[in-house]
Amino acid sequence: MRFKSIQQNIEDEGKVNVREVNPDSYAERDHGYTAGIFSDAEENFGITQQVADSTQNPTSKPKSRHAHFHETVHENPSEYSRSKCKQPTNEKEYDKAIEALVAKAIVEEHSGQQFPVYKGLEQYTLLQKMGDGAFSNVYKAIHNRTGEKVAIKVVQRAQPNTDPRDPRKRQGVESHNILKEVQIMRRVKHPNIIQLLEFIQTPEYYYLVLELADGGELFHQIVRLTYFSEDLSRHVITQVAHAIRYLHEDCGVVHRDIKPENLLFDSIDFVPSRVRKYRAGDDPDKVDEGEFIPGVGAGTIGRIRLADFGLSKVVWDSHTQTPCGTMGYTAPEIVRDERYSKGVDMWALGCVLYTILCGFPPFYDESISLLTKKVSRGEYSFLSPWWDDISKSAKDLISHLLTVDPESRYDIHQFLAHPWISGSREPTFPATDAPNTAQRENPFTYDFLEPEDVAAAGSAARTPGVNSLREVFNISYAAHRMEQEKIRKRGQRGNQGIMNFMGDMDDLMEENDDYDDGTKSVEHSMKRVNLSGENDPSLASRQPAQSQQQSSQRSRNKFKGFQLNLSKATLYNRRHRQKV
């Protein structure tokens, strides 16, 4: 009965609208009562399913899935609930929806863009592919009746394995993993978190219908703008922090995968800068970030939205308000486990802040093993000249987030109270293990390739270097999650009772499987992409001969401390060529 508290919590908060689509008729099933026809494991997550009446007319017009979802979810309204669907109330709104569909159909007809036909999504028209993963695709779509634009995550269900060499291997995502993500997403309602609108399943796929953030990924804006100003960085990271605070303190959830790819944004109108400001080492052709408007944003970046809860887990139960235990009887080991779990998100917050301020991640190496070692040891630096013009207060804040010891790392309340965030003029101090911000890096030469102007984030995201950078983020965060898991398990040794209890929680969250499978997948992806660029003819052709010789020479040299070969990372190519 280890699932009892979470099960009760879900029942108290209301049911998730889960729709099972009949593969024969694909008619809408909506009978008005729920029955648990999932397996026992699925029921333990508090997920219910709509069951069809055998006498239902398969030709009857289906109701709006969105309308039924909100009837169910808003039995207990939340102050953060703001995800009501746009329901046309007059002929004019219906005309607009139809016009949008026709316009898009014309565009697609001329572009020749085609999408798979997914049974169960007949009420939606797919407009654009926004991203993909090993077993999933994300599409921008429009609801055929209401005209509401949404994002739909299409996840392939695990199918029976036909490979006799590995009978345990299954292609696709297991039901308990996707249902865990759904269970967590339906609990959270916050303006800085993408909302789950509907969950649909067929024999082949799971469909997560999500709110659409029209700006796309923050990652693409880092590529486009190279880096963000301190004002825009503060605007972005503060919103992410508020989402984390809500998850940690109000929901008892840790995200465990906070990175630029999973930070989406609502776009705003661009206002050109009245006076352009440049930092040392900037390319004169750097894209204008635009005028920062307090409370609104800059560079088309408005409201930030946290997405993708595939690696999330619950660390405490809302009934006891304590970390996974009974009030007043919680062992120190479990309290520390909650601290370690939340610390993973705070570390990631520091990585994101570092990256958006300077344009590259704090941990980088072409070797996966060396990269993971640097992450586990916290070996980073504020590289000159790119950090020379960034305030000491910002560096101090980052140092408190990237400290190796989770007991010393800032929690979300300390982060939000820091002078750089709050805007106070109080003096700030670095963490005890922070790098020396006054020391200049070892005097070796950075050679940059001549950059090609990136006209749009979409084209930039398809370059080999950008794909490599994505994998650097993935490896860095996976390595840190595993390191924190080792620390947590070491702290549990010697107390078998606690080990058994936490073992149950591990089973509930499948966190060990997440770590192992996720890391193997990322390492495989890393091996497929070309981190170095040495074998990429398109990069080699743009690199001057002298640069190639110097790059080869640097690979034979040994430097102490943090090593970063900037000539081989495409994101850096947008920076001005300069000798340090």
Curated annotation (Swiss-Prot):
Keywords of this entry: ATP-binding, Cytoplasm, Kinase, Meiosis, Nucleotide-binding, Nucleus, Phosphoprotein, Serine/threonine-protein kinase, Transferase
PTM text: Phosphorylated by sty1.
Catalytic reaction list: L-seryl-[protein] + ATP = O-phospho-L-seryl-[protein] + ADP + H(+); L-threonyl-[protein] + ATP = O-phospho-L-threonyl-[protein] + ADP + H(+)
Positions bound to ATP: 130-138, 153
Induction line: Induced during environmental stress.
GO biological process, one term: mitotic DNA damage checkpoint signaling
SMART domains: S_TKc
InterPro entries in the cross-refs: Kinase-like_dom_sf, Prot_kinase_dom, Ser/Thr_kinase_AS
Protein name: Serine/threonine-protein kinase srk1
Source lineage: Eukaryota, Fungi, Dikarya, Ascomycota, Taphrinomycotina
